[in-house]
Amino acid sequence: IGTGGIAAELLGDTQTLILPVEPRDVLAAINRLQLAPLFSGYRGTPQGDLDAAVAAIMAMAAAMQNDAALDEIEVNPLMVAGQGKGAIAADAVIWMNDNQGD
């Protein structure tokens, strides 16, 4: 989990979670990011819909745990809207492997 785009690499603003995870783990990782204050209504901006962000990340985690053919999922960016307005994956790449659960 991290700041989107090249900022993730430039700033090193990332958090790594090992599956399985619980929603509280995802939320804690988000809150450890340098960009976390932006989700709290920084300088008058709307508070971010962290529930939706956590739900999106949990859905990706569930997919990874339940489908042996999935190798990696990258969403960049996951755009987090204002409180109660959701989150949307603007772009995603999914890498598949040859493992069919053997």
Language model feature labels by segment:
Residues 1-102:
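ATP-dependent carboxylate/acyl-activation modules
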